[in-house]
UniProtKB/Swiss-Prot annotation:
This is L-lactate dehydrogenase B chain. It comes from Mus musculus (Mouse). It catalyses: (S)-lactate + NAD(+) = pyruvate + NADH + H(+). Belongs to the LDH/MDH superfamily. LDH family. The modification N-acetylalanine is found at A2. It holds the Pfam family Ldh_1_N. Gene3D superfamilies: Lactate dehydrogenase/glycoside hydrolase, family 4, C-terminal, NAD(P)-binding Rossmann-like Domain. Pathway: Fermentation; pyruvate fermentation to lactate; (S)-lactate from pyruvate: step 1/1. The modification Phosphoserine is found at S11, S44.
């Protein structure tokens, strides 16, 4: 007796499952992981989305909740499992998993605890998707991107840290607000470490090709009567401010990660400030990852732009590198 489905649908091709073309995996379904997931779905970047976490009930609940929105999405397959086999054949894997910093905990201790988590996660990712590009989002992102590169054995053009893509977006938003224009028309770069020691490249800030530092030579210095330096301070403080108000940050980083993925999956060769291996650049001698303007396309992170930095900006970058290396050099089991 033919089933309803057989009566309704006449098969033309064999019913074998197609290998996905643009599969994306998100590891960790906390606030940041799910913001990444919804941003990826909202931009229709994936033909399959896989979620992985150790919390099985939470994981299944998030998967079902997204699946129930399938009518409003163009992503035909959404899957989840604590077993990494569900991630097989991913083009891009976003890592948001990790332990939270405890009150009074040193950064080194937090990093070492996250290294121990990554030692389980990263080999599993590479086992099932050996050709993937990994985007690291977990903090401290620059150090954990280095850790991922070490543990994965992947070439450095396929291990990327979300880095200062969000810091630069915050910078452009805050500058644009002051000027009354859209952030996409206000150009400026935050480089270096994602976080407290990031570097604002004031010499490159421009609107419609007009250098703002030429209009106000004191811009970004302590002598500036308009106090533009405060904008960079607001960028650095903004995460702490949001965390104080709502407990965590998630929407902006989720949108930022989807922006990076779009440049890669659509082979756009757009330039983003993301974390990459900077040894040999700007006189940095250690294997550290910092954000520089990088070209992202279908091959991953293919090139770095040689930004013309002023002496004090280079000094700040090197200081960032030293700060990170001080922590990295003491990490165990890499």
């Amino acid at each position: 007796m033919a089933t309803l489905k057989e009566k309704l649908i006449a098969s033309v091709a064999d019913d074998e499952a197609a290998v996905p073309n643009n599969k994306i995996t998100v590891v960790g379904v906390g606030q940041v992981g799910m913001a990444c997931a919804i941003s990826i779905l909202g931009k229709s970047l994936a033909d399959e989305l896989a979620l992985v976490d150790v919390l099985e009930d939470k994981l299944k609940g998030e998967m079902m909740d997204l699946q129930h929105g399938s009518l409003f999405l163009q992503t035909p397959k959404i899957v989840a499992d604590k077993d990494y086999s569900v991630t097989a054949n991913s083009k891009i894997v976003v890592v948001t998993a990790g332990v939270r910093q405890q009150e009074g905990e040193s950064r080194l201790n937090l990093v070492q605890r996250n290294v121990n988590v990554f030692k389980f996660i990263i080999p599993q990712i590479v086992k099932y998707s050996p050709d993937c590009t990994i985007i690291v989002v977990s903090n401290p992102v620059d150090i954990l991107t280095y850790v991922t590169w070490k543990l994965s054995g992947l070439p450095k053009h396929r291990v990327i840290g979300s880095g200062c893509n969000l810091d630069s977006a915050r910078f452009r938003y805050l500058m644009a607000e002051k000027l009354g224009i859209h952030p996409s028309s206000c150009h400026g770069w935050i480089l270096g470490e994602h976080g407290d020691s990031s570097v604002a490249v004031w010499s490159g800030v421009n609107v419609a090709g007009v250098s703002l530092q030429e209009l106000n030579p004191e811009m970004g210095t302590d002598n500036d009567s308009e106090n533009w330096k405060e904008v960079h301070k607001m960028v650095v403080d903004s995460a702490y401010e949001v965390i104080k108000l709502k407990g965590y940050t998630n929407w902006a980083i989720g949108l930022s990660v989807a922006d990076l993925i779009e440049s890669m999956l659509k082979n756009l060769s757009r330039i983003h400030p993301v974390s990459t291996m900077v040894k040999g650049m700007y006189g940095i001698e250690n294997e550290v990852f910092l954000s520089l303007p990088c070209i992202l396309n279908a091959r991953g992170l293919t090139s770095v732009i040689n930004q013309k930095l002023k002496d004090d900006e280079v000094a700040q970058l090197r200081k960032s590198a030293d700060t990170l290396w001080d922590i990295q050099k003491d990490l165990k089991d890499l």
